[in-house]
């Protein structure tokens, strides 16, 4: 393989790696948002139960 071909292969590998990491980063943002929503729902559930509210006043502010 010549230098030009090796450089082309290198660029293709870098491009593919960048695209994969970009897409996986975007996918994890969705999972993080879903986890945050679940945590918020759990806290709201706790705040509606008086014993839980008494035990965790910092959550229900």
Curated annotation (Swiss-Prot):
It comes from the Eukaryota. It is found in: Secreted. Expressed by the venom duct. Residues 1-21 form the signal peptide. The keyword Lipid biosynthesis does not apply. This is Alpha-conotoxine-like Am1.2. The cysteine framework is I (CC-C-C). Alpha4/7 pattern. Keywords: Acetylcholine receptor inhibiting toxin, Amidation, Disulfide bond, Neurotoxin, Postsynaptic neurotoxin, Secreted, Signal, Toxin. Alpha-conotoxins act on postsynaptic membranes, they bind to the nicotinic acetylcholine receptors (nAChR) and thus inhibit them. One of its GO terms (cellular component) is extracellular region. Contains 2 disulfide bonds. It comes from Conus amadis. The keyword Transport does not apply. GO terms for molecular function: acetylcholine receptor inhibitor activity; toxin activity.
